[in-house]
């Protein structure tokens, strides 16, 4: 298995210039187009004509992108860093592609399209520019679709069964839908999410594609809440959209992007503070945002203090020269009317960037907010459009600067912590169990990139590195057709059963032997089911492995039937129960369940000896899904090893259903179930495994419903 990272740009760049010259040239060249008469005096534009005939590779600085180049599990798909189509010939592109493969990078020679900028602007609360002033939406969306198709095609060239895809950019919102539900896809949302999504032309195609993700990580709780609300509106029973009825909702969480904090902190001790920025407090701003500068203007008009504004350029302007001209005019206005010194800064290396940060007193630049937090620099958190709230926050932060800020902020996470959190959640929700390599890596490749691939062996993307699969390969389950008496699979199972001397049947109850019902207490077995179990018990060992409580099992199943209750925590044999262990957070987990029960009308809390089940099948979908998700996330913090999602249920338990398989004799074994919890049994069963229903599974076979499964059991008695 590979982790395929889909991003707008690769972490590796290709150029004919030296790295520092290439970075400054890439960022500065578009500034020539700014329609402002004084631009030469305001901006130090870096134009390098000292290009070389030979191409060479280099990695982006650590502050621009977390360094995962030495992580053998990660494969990267995207445009080369700082890509410019005018710079390379077709032969250059071929050579770059061949060279980058040695570093698990698969380049796409494609520039960003305008629709990506529209998504960024609208979700950033600027709806006018693209919705009102630009009406060429259909063509823009068509080009955006073509752009995503290029990434899809490149990923499918290296994709193998069992790989996962990690989408890291809003330029690729259509990619999850193109990959489909069969490929596990996770997304790190790079822009804020809100109901303004509906202002984006063709937004429903974007939203439907995003819903194909298994796991989505937002960088703030408000984005997650907005997304969850929109999902519930679209999929809810009462007011939902019929077009979304078959959608499987992704797991959503809040988490920050990881950075190379160890490397950056180490460099901090080796560089000196940047000089030449005047005496006032230094505020860091993005160079192309009039909105952020207006917040500073509000601060100056309200408080009138002397400051230095440092405009940081770490990205190209995407051709938006008119906006940059407006920023420059506003800068002139501030310099004339207030005590303001302004400077532009284009860092071409990590030491340059850190040297500049050491002189800053406040960060109002979202793209480097995490790095600033790492160095103890206060970050403006308010909405950038609430100018006077921004003004007050700037004043408060500058007044308190230096009182409690320290390097190495605990709010900032490292790249491996980020990978661990993201991949653990994605693989878990996808039903995949792997040993993910989480060891920190020394950045060796970064310092030895070469067009000649010196010292590096070309990586075969079809060979699976790094991640070791714990269980057997999951193949599509073969359906057993019970109304066809000539079904070869059913006949094989029956023949093997009759030929074997030692025979064991291990079965779930709800959804397997009987249909799921609206209320759990109503699911008592019929006399037909009881008789079937007793008759089977006379010719083989019958084991019921269920999540139900001990009390329910005593009511439901004849005493001669062996039962593992509460997901294996309690075992009944010969009518006597043996209880397993519990876990330390059991009482706290129960109180959390009671809290959500009181706030979720229609829910039920089923208490068991070693845990409980929170049922939300009868809750309005608008409320139930949101409350269940909140309960699950809270329980994951309290007792993550003992909480599981099921079919309209959140369960807290101290054991796994696979306990029922531990003392199975050799011979014929059949294991059947319908829920996610039953996958634990399938993974350790050495005999026949049968999934009841149409959900994804690692079982070898499946039957349509409980009625068909009972028909199969009936054939064993013939």
Swiss-Prot record:
GO terms for molecular function: alpha,alpha-trehalose-phosphate synthase (UDP-forming) activity; trehalose-phosphatase activity. Its EC number is 3.1.3.12. CDD domains: HAD_TPP. Residues 459-470 have a biased composition (Basic residues). Signal peptide: none annotated. The keyword Cytoplasm does not apply. It catalyses: alpha,alpha-trehalose 6-phosphate + H2O = alpha,alpha-trehalose + phosphate. Residues 449-470 are annotated as: Disordered. InterPro entries: Glyco_trans_20, HAD-like_sf, HAD_sf, Trehalose_PPase. It comes from the Eukaryota. In the N-terminal section; belongs to the glycosyltransferase 20 family. In the C-terminal section; belongs to the trehalose phosphatase family. This is Probable trehalose-phosphatase. It comes from Encephalitozoon cuniculi (strain GB-M1) (Microsporidian parasite).
């Amino acid at each position: 298995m590979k982790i395929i990272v889909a991003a707008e740009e690769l972490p590796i760049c290709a150029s004919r210039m030296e790295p520092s010259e290439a970075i400054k040239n890439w960022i500065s060249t578009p500034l020539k187009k700014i329609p402002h008469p004084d631009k030469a005096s305001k901006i130090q534009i870096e134009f390098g004509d000292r290009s070389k005939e030979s191409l060479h590779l280099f990695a982006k600085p650590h502050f621009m992108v977390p360094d995962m180049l030495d992580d053998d599990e990660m494969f990267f798909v995207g445009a080369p860093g700082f890509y410019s189509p005018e710079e390379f010939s077709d032969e250059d592109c071929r050579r770059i592609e061949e060279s980058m493969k040695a570093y698990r990078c698969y380049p796409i020679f494609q520039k960003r399209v305008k629709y990506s900028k529209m998504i960024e602007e609208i979700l950033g609360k600027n709806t006018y520019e693209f919705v009102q002033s630009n009406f060429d939406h259909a063509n823009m969306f068509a080009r955006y679709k073509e752009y995503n198709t290029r990434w899809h095609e490149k990923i499918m060239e290296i994709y193998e069964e069992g790989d996962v895809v990690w989408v890291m950019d809003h330029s690729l919102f259509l990619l999850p839908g193109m990959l489909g539900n069969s490929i596990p896809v996770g997304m790190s949302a790079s822009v804020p999410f809100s109901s303004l999504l509906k202002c984006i032309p063709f937004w429903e195609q974007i939203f439907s594609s995003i819903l194909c993700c298994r796991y989505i990580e937002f960088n703030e709780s408000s984005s997650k809440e907005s997304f969850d609300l929109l999902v519930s509106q679209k999929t809810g029973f009462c007011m939902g959209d019929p077009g979304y009825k078959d959608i499987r909702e992704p797991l959503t969480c809040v988490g920050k992007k990881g950075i190379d904090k160890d490397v950056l902190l180490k460099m901090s001790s080796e560089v000196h503070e940047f000089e030449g920025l005047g005496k006032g407090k230094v505020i860091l701003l993005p160079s192309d945002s009039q909105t952020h500068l207006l917040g500073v203007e509000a601060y100056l008009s309200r408080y009138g203090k002397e400051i230095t504004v440092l405009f940081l350029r770490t990205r190209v302007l995407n051709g938006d020269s008119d906006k940059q001209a407006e920023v420059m005019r506003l800068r002139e206005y501030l310099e004339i009317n207030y005590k303001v010194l302004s400077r532009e800064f284009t860092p071409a290396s990590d030491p340059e960037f850190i040297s500049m940060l050491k002189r800053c007193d406040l960060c109002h630049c979202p793209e480097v907010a995490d790095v600033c937090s790492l160095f103890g620099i206060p970050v403006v958190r308010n909405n950038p459009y609430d100018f006077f709230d921004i003004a007050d926050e700037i004043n408060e932060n500058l007044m308190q600067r230096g009182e409690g800020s320290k390097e190495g902020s605990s709010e900032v996470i490292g790249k491996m912590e980020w990978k661990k959190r993201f991949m653990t959640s994605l693989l878990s929700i996808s039903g995949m169990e792997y040993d993910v390599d989480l060891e920190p890596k020394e950045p060796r490749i970064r310092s030895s990139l070469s067009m000649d691939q010196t010292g590096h062996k070309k990586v075969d993307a079809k060979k699976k590195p790094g991640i070791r699969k714990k269980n057997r390969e999951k193949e599509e389950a073969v359906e057993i057709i019970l109304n066809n008496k000539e079904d070869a699979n059913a006949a094989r199972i029956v023949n093997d059963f009759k030929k074997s001397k030692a025979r064991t049947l291990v079965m779930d109850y709800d959804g397997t032997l009987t249909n799921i019902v609206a209320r759990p207490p109503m699911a008592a077995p019929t006399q037909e089911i009881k008789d079937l179990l007793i008759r089977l018990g006379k010719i083989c060992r019958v084991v019921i492995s269920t999540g139900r409580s001990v009390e329910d099992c005593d009511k439901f199943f004849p005493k001669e039937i062996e039962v593992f209750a509460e997901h294996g925590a309690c075992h009944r044999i010969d009518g006597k129960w043996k209880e397993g262990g519990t876990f330390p957070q059991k009482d706290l987990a129960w109180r959390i369940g009671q809290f959500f029960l009181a706030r979720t009308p229609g829910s039920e809390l089923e208490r068991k000896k070693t845990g409980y089940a929170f049922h939300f099948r009868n809750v309005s979908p608008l409320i139930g899904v949101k409350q269940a998700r909140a309960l699950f996330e809270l329980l994951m913090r309290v007792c993550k090893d003992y909480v599981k999602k099921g079919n309209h249920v959140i369960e807290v338990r101290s054991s796994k259903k696979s306990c029922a398989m531990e003392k199975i004799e050799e011979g014929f074994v059949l294991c059947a179930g319908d829920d996610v919890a039953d996958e634990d049994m399938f993974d350790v069963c050495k005999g026949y495994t049968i999934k009841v229903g149409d959900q994804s599974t690692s079982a070898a076979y499946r039957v349509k419903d409980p009625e068909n499964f009972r028909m199969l059991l009936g054939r064993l008695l013939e």
